[in-house]
């Protein structure tokens, strides 16, 4: 596939957020060519993640508008900028909100995926190379979001945030691996590492929590206990391997960690916290068994949050860990997660509960705000 648009400005449709909390507007925008170490992508499928909604609502952070949101997507490389050697036009790719420069100490460490250059930055609305946007309308800039901005038919990303995948993989399924599903799956498989036959508690049964449960199912956990305040999520969660449910509301003043300890003869082997609520974090840590229990924090807290637990909980040989994007390095590791799906070791279809055409993207926001969807697939109408 040779690109006849390379080096030129592309006019295309994008869903622009003009102000906080207001419906997105489909506009014709201009997308500039990729600069040094950048790639321009044709987006084919994108899905809505709660992080998009959070920054669109702009309740807890500095608002930056107009902006093009979106960061879970699949597409095809349209053209590449100077210096890009590992990607070419026609490659099937997933853009990722965090990156891998492959040069820094984090990228060279086998333990970390938190690239110094390209790790997530929710405040930055411009490209790293020159501090400019690649999107504009009527000569005025439209800001980027987490380096991806996939609610546009074309977008420009840093090449370190673009993962080349098996061209046989269906982009309308594997695109969910570019954020939430990998975050939960990797939190379990790469960080909690439950053994076959073990017990695992998952706090929060949204997309990330269900992906964490899927990880526990793949690992062969014998009991997967789902904890959520919304009982309507319990039925769905069974498809992801969850065997038992705890709704904290059903237990009065009894702390959920005590409820779980009583269910499991002293505590679970592993827990994964996916809500970002500090009380849930304490419960997730204190519900693991002494001697070997490991709790993993995934959910993102509010700015001023802090939690406390007695140091004896740690001295009694419990471990508390944190993780970011499931400890996956985007370029090095995500292709193998796609391969897991292709080998039928990982199920993705069950995460995709709704589908809408790009022109109806605001419906995806409605489904998520009402708590009806796990993932809503948005199909571009090129």
From Swiss-Prot:
Binding locations of an alcohol: 51, 71
Catalysed reaction, written as an equation: a primary alcohol + NAD(+) = an aldehyde + NADH + H(+); a secondary alcohol + NAD(+) = a ketone + NADH + H(+)
Alphabetized InterPro entries for the sequence: ADH-like_C, ADH-like_N, ADH_Zn_CS, GroES-like_sf, NAD(P)-bd_dom_sf
Gene3D superfamilies per the UniProt record, alphabetical: Medium-chain alcohol dehydrogenases, catalytic domain (3.90.180.10), NAD(P)-binding Rossmann-like Domain (3.40.50.720)
Cofactor note: Binds 2 Zn(2+) ions per subunit.
Keywords, comma-separated and alphabetical: Cytoplasm, Metal-binding, NAD, Oxidoreductase, Zinc
GO molecular function: alcohol dehydrogenase (NAD+) activity; S-(hydroxymethyl)glutathione dehydrogenase [NAD(P)+] activity; zinc ion binding
Cofactor: Zn(2+)
Binding annotation for Zn(2+) 1: 49, 51, 71, 179
GO biological process, one term: alkaloid metabolic process
A cellular component annotation (GO) from this entry: cytosol
EC number: 1.1.1.1
Enzyme class, UniProt record, top EC level: oxidoreductase
Residues given in the record as NAD(+) binding sites: 51, 204-209, 228, 233, 275, 298-300, 325, 375
UniProt xrefs under PANTHER family: ALCOHOL DEHYDROGENASE, ALCOHOL DEHYDROGENASE 1
Subunit relationships: Homodimer.
Protein task: This protein is responsible for the conversion of alcohols to aldehydes in plants and is important for NAD metabolism during anaerobic respiration.
Protein family according to the UniProt entry: Belongs to the zinc-containing alcohol dehydrogenase family.
Designated name of the protein: Alcohol dehydrogenase 1
């Amino acid at each position: 596939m040779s690109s006849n648009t390379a080096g030129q400005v592309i006019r295309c449709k994008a869903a622009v957020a003009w102000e906080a909390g207001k419906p997105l507007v489909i506009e014709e925008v201009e997308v500039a060519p990729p600069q040094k170490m950048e790639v321009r992508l044709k987006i084919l499928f994108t899905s809505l993640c709660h992080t998009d909604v959070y920054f669109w609502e702009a309740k807890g952070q500095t608002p930056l508008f107009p902006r093009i949101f979106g960061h879970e997507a699949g597409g095809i490389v349209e053209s590449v900028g100077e210096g890009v050697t590992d990607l070419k036009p026609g490659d099937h790719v997933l853009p990722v909100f965090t990156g891998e420069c492959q040069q820094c100490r984090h990228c060279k460490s086998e333990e970390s995926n938190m690239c110094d250059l390209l790790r997530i930055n929710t405040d930055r609305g411009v490209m790293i190379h020159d501090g400019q946007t690649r999107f504009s309308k009527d000569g005025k800039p439209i800001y980027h979001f987490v380096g991806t901005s996939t609610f546009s038919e074309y977008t420009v990303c840093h090449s370190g945030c673009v993962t080349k995948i098996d061209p046989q993989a269906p982009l309308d399924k594997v695109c969910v691996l570019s954020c939430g599903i990998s975050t939960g799956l990797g939190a379990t498989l790469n960080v909690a590492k439950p053994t076959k036959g073990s017990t695992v508690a998952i706090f929060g049964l949204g997309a990330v929590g269900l992906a964490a449960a899927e990880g526990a199912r793949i690992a062969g956990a014998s009991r997967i206990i789902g904890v959520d305040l919304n009982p309507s999520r319990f039925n769905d969660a069974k498809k992801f391997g969850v065997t038992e449910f705890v709704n904290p509301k059903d237990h009065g003043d009894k702390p959920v960690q005590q409820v779980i300890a009583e269910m499991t003869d002293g505590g679970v082997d592993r827990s994964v916290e996916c809500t970002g609520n500090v009380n849930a974090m304490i419960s997730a840590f204190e519900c693991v068994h002494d001697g070997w229990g490991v709790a993993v924090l995934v959910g993102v807290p509010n700015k001023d949050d802090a939690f406390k637990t007695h140091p004896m909980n740690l001295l009694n040989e419990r471990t508390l860990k944190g993780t970011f994007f499931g400890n996956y390095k985007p370029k090095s590791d995500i292709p193998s997660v796609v391969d897991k799906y292709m080998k039928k070791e990982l199920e993705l279809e069950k995460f995709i509960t709704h589908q809408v055409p790009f022109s109806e993207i605001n419906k995806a926001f409605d489904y998520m705000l009402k708590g009806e969807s796990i993932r809503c697939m948005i199909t571009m109408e090129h």
